[in-house]
A protein has these predicted regions:
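N-terminal leader/targeting and accessory segments in enzymes
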Residues: 1-79
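Phosphate-binding loop of NTP-binding sites
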Residues: 5, 57-168
C-alpha cells in the first residue's frame, strides 16, 4: 500500500479506515502503522493528509483537513504521482493483467537494482536505496493523468469503468 511505501521511506504514518478487518491491514500492522476509525480529532496542524479514493469531502477527517491551511492535502493519485517522480518509474495500465504484470516486472527489476512497487491488490514496498518504482496505474476517473512515468506498459485496451467512460 502507499502507507507501507511511505513508512519504508522513513516517514511517520498513521491512518484511518472502516472498522472491518481487511487483509490489506497485515503489512500495516507488521510496520506498526496505527489504524483507527475516522475522527476529525486525528487531524493536526502541519499534518500531511493523503485522501484515499474511497472517501470524499463528507468524511470528517477529509472535511477538517481541507479546511485547515496548515494541513497539506493530496488526493491518493496526486501523491502517488509526486512520489513516482522521485524514482525512475514504470507505470502499468490496461484492462486486464495489470497486477500480474506489475508484480512480475518489479520482481525481475529488483534482481538488478533496488526497486519499489505498488500493486493494485494493496501490496507495496520501497526498499532502501530504491532507484526504480513500478506502479499499477489506475485509469479510473483519469487518475493515471497524475503520473508521469519514464516508461509505460499498456497490457490491453477494452471498454472498462463504464460508469465513468462512455466509450473507448
Amino acid at each position: 500500500s502507499l502507507a507501507t511505501i511511505v513508512s519504508d521511506r522513513g516517514d511517520e504514518v498513521s491512518g484511518s479506515d472502516i472498522e472491518k478487518y481487511i487483509f490489506t491491514q497485515k503489512p500495516l500492522e507488521e510496520r506498526h502503522i496505527p489504524i483507527t476509525t475516522f475522527s476529525e480529532d486525528h487531524i493536526h496542524e502541519g499534518d500531511i493528509v493523503i485522501i484515499g479514493n474511497a472517501f470524499d469531502e463528507s468524511n470528517p477527517e477529509v472535511k477538517k483537513a481541507l479546511s485547515m491551511d496548515s494541513v497539506k492535502t493530496y488526493w491518493y493519485h496526486e501523491f502517488l504521482g509526486k512520489l513516482a517522480k522521485e524514482y525512475t518509474s514504470v507505470s502499468v495500465a490496461g484492462t486486464h493483467g495489470k497486477t500480474t504484470t506489475t508484480g512480475m516486472l518489479s520482481h525481475v527489476m529488483s534482481l538488478a537494482a533496488p526497486t519499489g512497487y505498488l500493486i493494485g491488490d494493496g501490496t507495496g514496498e520501497m526498499p532502501k536505496d530504491s532507484r526504480y518504482f513500478v506502479l499499477e496505474s489506475c485509469e479510473y476517473q483519469r487518475h493515471f493523468l497524475a503520473y508521469t512515468p519514464e516508461y509505460a506498459i499498456i497490457t490491453n485496451i477494452e471498454l472498462d469503468h463504464v460508469d465513468y467512460y462512455k466509450d473507448m
